[in-house]
Amino acid sequence: MIKKLIAILTLATSSVYADQTLTAQAWLVADHNGKILEGSNMSEVRSIASITKLMTAMVVLDSGQSLTEIIPKKLYNKQLTREILIDLAIVKSDNNAAQMLCDYYPGGYNSCIEAMNQKALALQMINSTFTDPTGRMHTNVSTAHDLIKLVFAASTYPLIVQASNMDAVRWNISKKKNIEFRNTNSLVGHGYKFLVSKTGFINKAGGCIVMMIDTANGIRTVVLLGSKNTKTRIPEAKMLSMLY
């Protein structure tokens, strides 16, 4: 009985602590089964910025297009494969990479956007709408509750899991020059194991991040929307993953 009471008090204290220290307008933490452990404003529809790129990557992978195909249009003065564009979209959150993935989707850009919304419906993300592949438009919206479904779906794609754990995208552009783009989640590459990681920011959305991470308490999925800025979102998400 005493242990149960202590557990209840600890959980209540944790909830109050999180509410007092977070700048995020909506958030939640879920366990390995998707059971929500704690959250706030989970059903509030909000702009999700570059979290959108997870959906872009998924529909491109669903299409069955060759990952080794070189895309005709250049990025960083180089023709890149579809796989590298996916890496750039997830790791660097590169808008041009995400745009190109959609532009070269079967049927073109509009078919890509349609596929993103159809995928959302298939995942029962009933409060989510996608209007562009990058997240630059504030009309890409979802809820913390819907994004749990997105993260769990993304975790079943090996390439997304791989990219989520890359601290940077690197390649040689000449014998003497390398190019490197760091992961927008600064936790990656510092001893943490991620199944999914994606950040986002536009003024309308605020600082955003979704991540599925292996913690001392087990697998935790964190969705955080509307944080004050790009500097607050990651510490807040890290705190939530450790708190619950």
Put a short name on every predicted segment.
Residues 10-11, 60, 240:
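Enrichment for repetitive, rod-forming helical segments
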Residues 19-26, 30, 107-244:
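Penicillin-recognizing serine hydrolase domain
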Residues 4-13:
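Sec-dependent N-terminal signal peptides
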Residues 17-145, 149-158:
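Active-site-adjacent loops and short helices of periplasmic peptidoglycan-processing enzymes
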